[in-house]
Amino acid sequence: MNYTGTKDGAAKGKRAGLEAMQNTLKYLFDAKNLGTYVLRNMRNNASPPQLSVHATGRAADIQPKTDADTNRLIKFLVDNAETLHIEEVHDYKDGTHGRGWRCSRRELDGKAGWKQWTAQDNGGSAGALWCHYEIAPDFADSPEKVAAAFKKVFGK
């Protein structure tokens, strides 16, 4: 799988597949939805400003009740990334500046993996207790694909 980022441009609104995934994860991890679609730029100092993946309708922020549950959610997303078509996961509370997992990293010869963030290169919310994740475009538009993927994860 390749990382899409914002190549698909801004969406016109919420996308049904991402909303289905967010609702399922909220249920599984007793978590709060902190937001999905919003038309905005990334929260960084990039010049010129860069579109947020939230604006594509493929990114979500979610916060379980405890740090341990957030860690379980992050592990679940990364462990099942191929099946769930997860392209990126942000762990803001890891280390000083957080870390990001991506389905394909240049520095890892295109393989999936974690990158520890620095003061200059980070996800913009160091120390935050929530998780950010991004899904592939084909899943963002298909609650049916999302439901089938969760069934596969749980062996049903």
Task: Label each residue range with its predicted role.
Residues 116-124:
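Short proline/glycine-enriched turn/loop segments at secondary-structure junctions
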Residues 1-104, 119, 128-135:
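Secreted/periplasmic proteins that engage bacterial cell-wall peptidoglycan
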Residues 101-115:
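Mixed-charge, low-complexity intrinsically disordered segments
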Residues 8, 135-156:
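Low-complexity, Gly/Ser/Thr/Pro-rich intrinsically disordered linker/tail segments
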Residues 95-96, 108-112, 124:
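Intrinsically disordered, low-complexity coil segments
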